């Protein structure tokens, strides 16, 4: 390494070891029954509103929502929720395409997973057409010939745009081309683009020349003619003669995989596009001499009832003008529009597009004069609307052109055509409501576009929180139909109550209790069931994890002796759990009539919230009991207890009592585990050991694969573990005695002999004295002599 003259400062890693990061102590795991939720998936929630989002709100007969709300209201900050159900199926619906046949499958779900149960039967989905791009087509001509074009110097064409008085003179010169005798469509288009701002041109995928107007309307028109003034005619070489020289003849079928558009905004390669025309009738004759008034025509639109269009002398200031005629028709038009073509003749158009769009003119009934001839419609042949769907192939933003994959089945008159993308909007609603729970706009059924409906709504992070989608036509080639507009209800959602086996679950499939295997929790509760089998499994699960603790309660209706009998089988020498009784009374959030304003619930969630609150304020080594351990939301208890009752429950049954304390409220009044070994008697001791184990386990991962020598052992002992334990001691976790009397660290050659080192073992031993709670307060009150004397005066 080269150094500069002067002071050079280098940063190196040094010999410091990572410090111990305190492990979390109060993330609660809840196994619950709930209104909804993806079964057997541990979902992280940080508020009750989060819980409602994923699992629904309160439901009669279930305690999960009450427990979770109690947890957060009592100081909890983070929980993992697992929904348990018996046999369950999601609600479903099939959305058909307009032409029939299934287009989209819908299931009740959450972020791409099935969310089964009866809750989904209250959902419906509404589909609305929602094209993300719709564009009109300007007048355009596709030349018949294919490049190269045999042009000569000083050749050209004249292009009349929208019946302008003077045509645009397009002239070709040798300098415009690499080889004018073998001119390309792109080279010719570049010359045309420079000729006038009213024209634009491009090359088709088949190497034809396309010329387009820059405006799109019924009056948009292009006509190509031979040039004058001694300029060589290039129209024949380009293929711009006869029908191919007039935009009114439409885009010819042979070359109809491209169109100039008014705007390509919103079109994407791979998207589905619908190319539509609308029913129209164009007057072949100019407006003639006015008839005797009243006069009129009957216009039939899309096969409906005839619309009577009538003209009176009062519609005109004098001799009828085209503007007055248009205004009179527009005042009466229903379902159709009227405009003028480039030559000034009239055109009537249906306001609908595609198949079924029709318009026809007939003489009026009765004494009204027939205005057909006056308006120029004598001999007019109506043209029905058409439509064809295809896949967008390319987008030319600069040239404003769109190409698609296959040729049209019929010629396309740009004046009455549009191209729109095929997208839809899907709204999810609750039954009986018109306000959507969520709405997804711009969805497509094309699999290779970003807005493919199943991809968007099934996204695991940003997808729908109510439904999942499936494509019954996945893998089918070409354009797939969108679901037809309309509202469809979901149905068939069902569920049964979970069995003990469902609550316990399987380690192989990570269901039930084992759904928590992949996440960190330090507390565990199952407020829905007090089944002995489930409680035993939960206690065993926590013990096997070694970092968590179960909190349970006896069933409602048990008296003190019944509670002790219930808890007896769960007691053992070393148990990772605690029991609390009796049930607590809270306000009933489901009561809207005042008939049942309060209800009893198991205290599990509220107790875990107190655990979290007191650990955050005082440290995990502080017993979560006493006057500070108030259960917020609790209005009462199932039965009262005297001091003697509490002592009996705690000493004999190892069950912690919840009772009303005057001046304090409803409090947790003891902190025993179910352990019979006095070393593991208290909740705070169990929690402190779990905390120390987890913290050291997390922070000593750096030791793996390090060279095992005395230097490593010293780093671990003095640089990592010692500062951590000193920090806990200074906060009171080990009492007030000197540090060397309350904890010991052993990490040296005595517990890492060469034989173990050779086998890859690294042994660290930590011993500490956990502070115990003052559980029985003994106050002695007695009299003493005052020492005063009396005397007679």
Where do the protein language model's features map onto the residues?
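Polar helix-capping/helix-linker motif
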Residues: 446-452, 462, 531, 709
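Long, low-complexity, polar/charged, intrinsically disordered or flexibly structured peripheral segments
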Residues: 470-504
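Peri-functional-center coupling elements
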Residues: 177-179, 183, 462-464, 474
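Extended, beta-strand-rich, solvent-exposed assembly scaffolds of outer structural proteins
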Residues: 50-55, 70, 90-139, 143-454
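Structured, hydrophobic secondary-structure cores that serve as assembly/anchoring elements
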Residues: 1-92, 429-434, 477, 484, ...
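Phosphate/oxyanion-binding active-site loops and adjacent basic polyanion-contact surfaces
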Residues: 181-185, 318-322, 495-509, 716-717
């Amino acid at each position: 390494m080269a150094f500069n003259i002067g002071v050079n400062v280098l940063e190196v890693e040094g010999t410091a070891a990572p410090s111990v990061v305190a492990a979390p102590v109060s993330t609660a795991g809840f196994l619950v029954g709930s209104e909804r939720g993806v079964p057997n998936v541990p979902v992280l929630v940080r508020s009750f509103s989060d819980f409602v989002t994923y699992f629904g709100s309160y439901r009669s007969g279930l305690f999960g929502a009450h427990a979770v709300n109690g947890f957060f209201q009592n100081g909890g900050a983070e929980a993992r929720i697992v929904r348990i159900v018996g046999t369950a199926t999601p609600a479903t619906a099939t959305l058909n395409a307009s032409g029939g046949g299934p287009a989209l499958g819908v299931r009740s779900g959450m972020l791409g997973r099935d969310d089964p149960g009866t809750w989904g039967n209250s959902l419906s989905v509404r589909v609305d057409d929602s094209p993300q791009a719709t564009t009109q087509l300007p007048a355009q001509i596709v030349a018949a010939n294919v490049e190269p074009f045999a042009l000569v110097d000083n050749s050209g064409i004249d292009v009349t745009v929208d019946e302008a008085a003077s045509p645009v003179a397009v002239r070709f010169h040798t300098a415009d081309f690499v080889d004018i005798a073998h001119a390309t469509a792109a080279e010719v288009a570049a010359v045309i683009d420079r000729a006038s701002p009213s024209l634009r041109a491009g090359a088709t995928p088949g190497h034809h020349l396309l010329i387009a107007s820059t405006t799109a309307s019924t009056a948009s028109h292009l006509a190509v003619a031979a040039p004058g003034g001694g300029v060589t005619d290039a129209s024949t070489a380009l293929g711009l003669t006869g029908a191919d020289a007039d935009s009114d003849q439409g885009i010819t079928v042979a070359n109809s995989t491209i169109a100039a558009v008014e705007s390509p905004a919103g079109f994407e390669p791979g998207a589905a596009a619908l190319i539509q025309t609308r029913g129209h009738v164009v007057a072949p004759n100019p407006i003639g001499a006015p008839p005797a008034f009243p006069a009129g025509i009957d216009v039939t639109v899309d096969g409906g009832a005839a619309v009577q269009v009538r003209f009176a002398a009062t519609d005109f200031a004098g001799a009828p003008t085209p503007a007055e005629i248009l205004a009179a028709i527009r005042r009466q038009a229903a379902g159709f529009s009227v405009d003028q073509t480039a030559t000034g003749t009239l055109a009537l158009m249906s306001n609908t597009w595609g198949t079924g769009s029709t318009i026809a003119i007939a003489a009026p009934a009765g004494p009204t004069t027939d205005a057909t001839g006056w308006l120029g419609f004598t001999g007019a042949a109506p043209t029905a609307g058409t439509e064809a769907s295809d896949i967008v192939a390319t987008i030319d933003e600069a040239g404003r052109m769109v190409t698609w994959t296959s040729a049209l089945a019929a010629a396309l008159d740009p004046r009455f055509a549009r191209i729109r993308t095929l997208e839809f909007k899907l709204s999810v609603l609750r039954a009986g409501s018109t306000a959507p729970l969520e709405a997804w706009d711009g969805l497509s059924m094309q699999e290779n576009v970003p807005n493919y409906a199943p991809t968007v709504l099934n996204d695991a992070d940003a997808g729908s929180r109510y439904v999942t989608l499936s494509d019954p036509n996945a893998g089918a080639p070409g354009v797939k139909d969108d679901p037809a507009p309309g509202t469809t209800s979901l149905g068939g959602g069902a569920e049964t109550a979970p069995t003990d086996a469902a609550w316990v679950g399987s380690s192989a499939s990570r269901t039930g209790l084992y759904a928590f295997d992949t996440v960190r929790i330090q507390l565990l509760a199952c407020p829905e069931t007090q089944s002995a089998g489930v409680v035993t499994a939960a206690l065993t699960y926590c013990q096997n994890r070694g970092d968590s603790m179960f909190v349970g309660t006896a069933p409602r209706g048990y008296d003190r002796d019944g509670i002790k009998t219930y808890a007896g089988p769960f007691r053992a020498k070393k148990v990772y759990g605690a029991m609390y009784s009796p049930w607590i009374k809270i306000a009933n959030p489901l009561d809207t009539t005042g008939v049942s304003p309060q209800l009893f619930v198991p205290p599990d969630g509220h107790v875990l919230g107190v655990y979290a609150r007191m650990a955050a304020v005082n440290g995990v080594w502080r017993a979560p009991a006493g006057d500070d351990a108030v259960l917020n939301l609790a209005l009462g208890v199932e039965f009262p207890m005297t001091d003697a009752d509490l002592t009996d429950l705690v000493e004999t049954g190892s069950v912690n009592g919840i009772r009303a304390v005057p001046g304090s409220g409803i409090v947790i009044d003891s902190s025993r585990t179910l352990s019979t070994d006095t070393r593991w008697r208290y909740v705070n001791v169990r929690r402190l050991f779990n905390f120390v184990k987890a913290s050291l386990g997390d922070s000593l991962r750096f030791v793996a694969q390090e060279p095992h020598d005395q230097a490593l052992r010293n780093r671990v002992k003095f640089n990592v573990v010692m500062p951590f334990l000193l920090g806990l001691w200074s906060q009171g976790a080990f009492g007030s005695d000197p540090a060397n009397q309350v904890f010991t660290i052993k990490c040296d050659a005595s517990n890492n002999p060469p034989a173990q080192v050779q086998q890859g073992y690294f042994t660290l031993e930590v011993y500490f004295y956990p502070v115990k709670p003052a559980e029985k307060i003994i106050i002695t009150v007695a009299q003493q002599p005052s020492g005063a004397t009396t005397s007679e005066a």
